[in-house]
Amino acid sequence: MKFSTRAERIEPFYVMEVAKAAQAMAREVAGTREPMIFLNIGEPDFTAPPLVQQAAERAIRDGLTQYTNALGLEPLRERISDWYATRFGVDVPARRIVVTAGASAALQLACLALIDAGDEVLMPDPSYPCNRHFVSAAEGKAVLIPTTAEERFQLSAAKVEAAWGEKTRGVLLASPSNPTGTSIAPDELRAIHQVVRAKGGLTIIDEIYLGLSYEEQYSHSALALGDDIISINSFSKYFNMTGWR
């Protein structure tokens, strides 16, 4: 079977191979040394809370398994809106919320909806490897901007300003970040957004690890900066539901 040129551009997701190798190593030494702590994949060691499991059982028993609204179940979107208000103090109307089959699907859909062929999207390097492929699938170009430990491996407003060009469409950020685990300082995130807004660009931010930070200053959603922020969140990490999609 001949694959598309688009598919040929996608690199393997190497972290899964690393995870398999680590699991094999853990099995080999099981019982002979201290248990291993896995730092290679973004997945909790425990499953979803009992209330979530019970809700899934009820849905199956009650026959709630048919097509839903394309934007997601309306009661679910309302509850997500309430959760943002309660947890983060942010007003996000349900009409702004779209439910997808996972955060990767949301990132891909956002890129397809907002990026045209030839558009450039700025993102830090290192960053989540799939992000550049989401942009590429939309016929855009990911512009990787090197970052350092001193910069928390995150972009700054100054770097965004310096890298912005005629073809730049916007930025794709992650806070907290995968794979580095670092967050963007609130003042810096605000400054980045101001630069992007002044350029007429878009700000997409991956917030699927939001709420898992031990530092209060990094526990706020970027959605508080304005209704032109596109935030991607997920049940996978905070609610321990990686395989539930």
Residue ranges and their predicted role:
Residues 91-97, 117-120, 167, 227-228:
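Short acidic capping loops at alpha-helix termini that bridge into adjacent secondary structure
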Residues 103-107, 127-131, 239:
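Conserved coil-to-alpha-helix start sites within the AMP-binding
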Residues 125, 144-148:
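Short beta->alpha connector loops at strand-helix junctions that form conserved
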Residues 18, 136, 143, 154-170, ...:
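Active-site pre-lysine segment of PLP-dependent enzymes
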Residues 113-135:
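Conserved PLP-anchoring active-site segment centered on the Schiff-base-forming lysine
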Residues 243-245:
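Short, intrinsically disordered, charge-balanced linker/junction segments flanking boundaries
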Residues 39, 175-178:
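Flexible low-complexity scaffold tracts in large eukaryotic assembly proteins
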Residues 8-102, 109:
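N-terminal small-domain helix-loop-helix segment of the aminotransferase-like
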